[in-house]
Curated annotation (Swiss-Prot):
Intervals of motif 'KMSKS' region: 638-642
Entry EC number(s): 6.1.1.4
Catalysed conversion reaction: tRNA(Leu) + L-leucine + ATP = L-leucyl-tRNA(Leu) + AMP + diphosphate
Name of the encoding gene: leuS
Enzyme class: ligase
Motif residue range(s): 'HIGH' region: 43-53
InterPro entries: aa-tRNA-synth_I_CS, aa-tRNA-synth_Ia, Leu-tRNA-lgase_arc, Leu-tRNA-synth_Ia_arc/euk, M/V/L/I-tRNA-synth_anticd-bd, Rossmann-like_a/b/a_fold, tRNAsynth_Ia_anticodon-bd, Val/Leu/Ile-tRNA-synth_edit
Main location: cytoplasm
Organism taxonomic ancestry: Archaea, Thermoproteota, Thermoprotei, Thermoproteales, Thermoproteaceae
Protein's name according to its UniProt entry: Leucine--tRNA ligase
Keywords of the record: Aminoacyl-tRNA synthetase, ATP-binding, Cytoplasm, Ligase, Nucleotide-binding, Protein biosynthesis
Length: 946
């Protein structure tokens, strides 16, 4: 631990104790006072939280602290998510003696051998990392109300979740049936993002299978995402070196890759008859079920047996990879199917040639494929003459009937419509089927097993596909604030594709499904409305309510206002006044004002949060805002356990100290951006905080009581502007912008001020107090220490947001002096070696005001001599926009007094003595005839060369 880190940790521990003693972050309802209720995603205690979690919690903490300064009654609570399989899986792996995982936990998290031995018990593991993570949050300086802490296996919480699920079931939003889910073959259970390594959500996609058949009746089920192109198939691809099987599936003998047969076995009954190499099937001919054409089976080593069925159809007119491969073989046959504006008959050929692709191994084929597929899907229309290729092998009248259907629903239709039609038609005609797959494979369970798709029977699902529910969810997304704004489109897209989702499992920690024994509600389903539970758990415990008293009637009254307090209280055996008190607590804090999480939770948790709120709560209790921050990298790389570069939050605090760490996580990127955490940046911010500390100490120790000068007024004005910009940044959750203003720009202003004055004034101390209050949300312990040094009363954390008024005249004086210094430095005589500088001030400021934005006549009418009027107007035009604006606002300005006030600053900047004269003073020497050259804010300058 460095000396700097030690200093910041000691400061932090002092103020953490004082906050806890004063219960600064434990609010109670205050009717009439505005409230701000913010939550961030509670963590899984299957490991210690890391700096990625720290960033999410920091954003929420900064928002909470800022609102407290604005006078809000702020609630920021925290809990721990024990539900699901992550904790159970890790405990099992450790109990089994998995050396890699054990070393990982010892190296990354610093777990002792004694604790490792006990972690075979899932509850011990959870409680260990719960404790470590909570300690890390406290050390990090999060202003959390720990009096409302709970875990998701607490009996009170389980009663709450059972109430939620009964509500969903009674509204028809929980169903039982057949549906594809991500599945761990080892644990024999559905999985979601929180059950997988790196929290990777298994993305389930659907292949259309098209049954090509050889002369022996063997089916070659091509798996495709583009079934509308089947009329243009010229051949089939099979990998000659891959392992295939002949297997029975859905009553047919099929050729499948061995891997595909394994994956399909979770979706239906697969019986492997024999194994074979792919080359056995190369050279055969198969019948296209749509066109009746016999097409060859070619070998292609680019076919991945782990994708689809390992059997691929080739459409060279519309697939760049197919075109390039067949061109290499000299076997190109092109059949046009889709018209796209801006492309010719054969889009794949056209794009391959335009991009200069020479072979089937060219990496540019990926880009070519994206271009063609995107253009055809978004703008493509199936050609009308495709009908002539349909079913020529069928006898009449079947041929005419099929062609009539294709003419109506396929030919001339947009690709999207044609795709939906032909997929359905193939299945209904028995010429195709469906295969589900993990489209973002490989995805691994935390136990190390690769996830597959299983079609479950009699599984419990939350039906996120229900249309009316989707519409309510869209309505909330459109109404609420979402930061960043561009994430709104991702929420709407997620709402569109969400369908049934498995909501219960047969193993793991959590809440039992209330109406079906043996099922446990899974982790992404019991974590959608728990924000409401924060508002009441403290009172439930304080009043000594038992879990069995927390009935459906209890929750209906507390959260929905249904029933009367007297009747409900009588039935559950509590005091009606106590019940009303709990209801008032919820009613005061809800709705949630901001929900904070990482952007990776948009496709699951955050969208489920929206769905469940609109399903259960009345409109006035719907959440108001979501903030989704970017990821955290470390030294340019994604953090992962395999790379051993995960930085636990408690280790980071020990390494840098909490406030330098907070400053770095705030300043390194705006909330919507991914943040690259770098050691050098953290150390630089640590040094910057020490510079601020030394500056404030110097200011506090040397300040004197005296009349305010131009310099004091300038300082206050600059700080007022910094605070104004910082406040706007905080309000927009632009933490980087706020941190730059407060950690660097403000420090530069104070440093310059101290360099300009002999002794700082007491008004400068008041300006520093204002700065410290604005700093507090980002570096709270450090701010408290500075607040104490400056003589602030109470806590900086609870001080109101400062009100400083900028003085335009003081700002004008400083800008004027800086312009003067620049003018002198640009004079050749000064560059040649100045010995002394004489400055002649024209005090007729009103002439310049009249000239700003006006003409010569206006300047003359204001009293300017005709011989100076044009120069005045030209000078007014040359002034920067800021100075021009200040001149328009400042009615009276004593240029001579301002310059005298800044004399020391000017002499220091120029490095020579400076004499200041009034241009109209007859007693003043007219060196070089510079009196008459003086204009308001542009004095005459004489330089004595040594």
């Amino acid at each position: 631990m460095s000396e700097l880190a030690k200093f910041f940790i000691e400061v932090a521990e002092k103020w953490q104790r004082r906050w806890a003693e004063a219960k600064v972050f434990e609010p109670s309802p205050q009717p009439g006072r505005p409230k701000f209720f913010i939550t961030a995603a509670y963590p899984y205690p299957n490991g210690t939280i890391h700096i990625g979690h720290g960033r999410t919690y920091l954003v929420a903490d900064v928002m909470a602290r800022f609102r407290r300064h604005l006078g809000y009654n702020v609630l920021f609570p925290m809990a721990f998510h024990y539900t699901g399989t992550p904790i159970l899986t890790i405990a099992e792996v450790i109990a089994a003696g998995d050396k890699a995982v054990i070393e990982e936990y010892k190296e990354i998290y610093g777990v002792s051998d004694d604790d490792i031995k006990k972690m075979g018990d899932p509850l011990y593991l959870a409680q260990y990392f719960h404790r470590r993570s909570k300690e890390a949050m406290i050390k990090f300086g999060l202003g959390i109300d720990w009096s409302r802490e709970f875990t998701t296996i607490d009996p009170e919480y389980q009663r709450f979740i059972q109430w939620q699920f009964e509500k969903l079931r009674k509204r028809g939003l929980i169903v039982r049936g057949r549906h594809p889910v991500g599945w761990c073959p080892r644990h024999q259970m559905p999985v979601g993002a929180h059950d997988t390594k790196d929290d990777k959500e298994p993305e389930i996609g659907q292949w259309t299978l098209i049954y090509f058949v050889d002369g022996e009746g063997l089916v070659y089920p091509t798996a495709t995402l583009r079934p509308e192109t089947v009329p243009g198939v010229t051949n089939i691809w099979i990998n000659p070196d891959a392992e295939y099987v002949v297997a029975e599936f859905e009553g047919r003998k099929m050729v499948l890759s061995k891997d595909a047969a394994y994956r399909l076995s979770f979706q239906g009954n697969v019986k492997v008859i024999r194994e074979a190499r792919g080359r056995e099937f190369v050279g055969r001919r198969v019948l296209n079920p749509v066109t009746g054409e016999w097409v060859p089976v070619y070998e292609a080593k680019f076919v991945d047996p782990k994708v689809g069925t390992g059997v691929v159809m080739s459409v060279p007119a519309h697939a760049p990879y197919d075109y390039a491969a067949l061109r290499d073989m000299g076997e190109v046959k092109l059949i046009p199917l889709i018209r796209v504006e801006g492309y010719g008959e054969y889009p794949a050929k056209e794009v391959v040639e335009r991009m200069g692709i020479k072979s089937q191994t060219d990496p540019a084929l990926e880009e070519a494929t994206r271009e063609v597929y995107s253009a055809e899907y978004t703008r493509g229309v199936v050609r009308e003459d495709v009908v002539d290729r349909i079913a020529p092998h069928l006898p009449e009248p079947a041929r005419s009937m099929v062609r009539a259907v294709f003419k109506l629903y396929f030919a001339g239709r947009p690709v999207k419509e044609a795709r939906e039609f032909i997929s359905k038609w193939l299945a209904e005609a028995g010429l195709g089927g469906v295969m589900y797959d993990i489209m973002n494979k490989p995805v691994y369970c935390r136990c190390g097993t690769e996830i597959v798709v299983k079609v479950l029977e009699d599984q419990w699902f939350i039906n996120y596909g229900e249309r009316g529910w989707k519409q309510l969810a869209r309505q909330l997304v459109e109404e609420m604030a979402i930061i960043p704004q561009e994430a709104k489109a991702q929420f709407l897209a997620t709402i569109d594709w969400l369908d049934k989702r498995a909501c219960a499992r047969t193993r793991g920690l959590g809440t039992p499904l209330p109406w079906s024994q043996g099922w446990v509600i899974e982790s992404l389903s019991d974590s959608t409305i728990y924000m409401a539970f924060y508002t009441v758990i403290k009172k439930i415990r304080a009043l000594g309510l038992r879990p069995e008293q927390l009935t459906e009637e209890f929750w209906d009254y507390v959260f929905l206002g249904q029933g009367s307090a007297a009747e409900v209280a009588k039935r559950i055996g509590v005091d009606p006044a106590a019940l009303e008190e709990i209801r008032r607590e919820f009613d005061y804090w809800y709705p949630l004002d901001s929900r904070n999480s990482g952007k990776d939770l948009i496709p699951n948790h955050l969208t489920f949060f929206i769905f469940n709120h609109v399903a259960i709560f009345p409109r006035e209790k719907w959440p108001r805002q979501i903030v989704a921050n970017g990821w955290v990298l470390r030294e340019g790389e994604k953090m992962s356990k395999s790379k051993r570069n995960v930085l636990p939050l408690d280790k980071a605090v020990a390494l840098y100290g909490p406030d330098p760490l907070r400053a770095t996580l705030a300043i390194a990127a705006e909330v919507e951006q991914d943040l690259d955490f770098r050691d050098a940046e953290a150390r630089r911010n640590s040094q910057q905080l020490m510079s601020i500390y030394n500056l404030v100490q110097r200011l506090a120790q040397s300040a004197v009581e005296r009349e305010e000068t131009w310099l004091d007024k300038w300082l206050i004005s600059e700080v007022a502007h910094v605070l104004e910009r910082a406040r706007e940044a905080y309000e927009k959750v632009r933490l980087r912008q706020a941190a730059v203003e407060l950690l660097y720009n403000a420090e530069a202003v104070f440093s310059q001020y101290l360099s300009m004055v002999d002794k700082p004034s007491k008004s400068a101390v008041e300006a520093a107090k204002a700065w410290v209050v604005a700093l507090e949300p980002i570096v709270p312990h450090f701010a408290e220490e500075l607040w104490q040094i400056l003589g602030g009363e109470g806590f900086a954390a609870t001080a109101p947001w400062p009100k400083l008024s900028p003085d335009p005249a003081a700002l004008l004086a400083k800008r004027y002096v800086d312009m003067l210094i620049e003018d002198v430095k640009n004079i050749p005589a000064y560059k040649a070696g100045a010995k002394r500088v004489a400055i002649y001030v024209n005090g007729n400021y009103q002439w310049l005001r009249a000239a700003v934005g006006k003409d010569v006549k206006a300047a003359i009418e204001a009293g300017a001599p005709p011989q100076l009027a044009k120069r005045l107007v030209d000078f007014a035009k040359s002034m920067g926009e800021e100075v021009r604006g200040l001149v328009e606002r400042v009615e009276q300005f004593d240029e001579y007094a301002a310059l005298q006030s800044y004399k020391r600053y000017v002499e220091k900047a120029l490095g020579v003595p400076v004499d200041i004269y009034k241009a109209d003073d007859p007693q003043a020497p007219d060196l070089g005839g510079k009196k008459k050259a003086a204009l308001p804010l542009k004095p005459g300058i004489f330089i004595e060369v040594g």
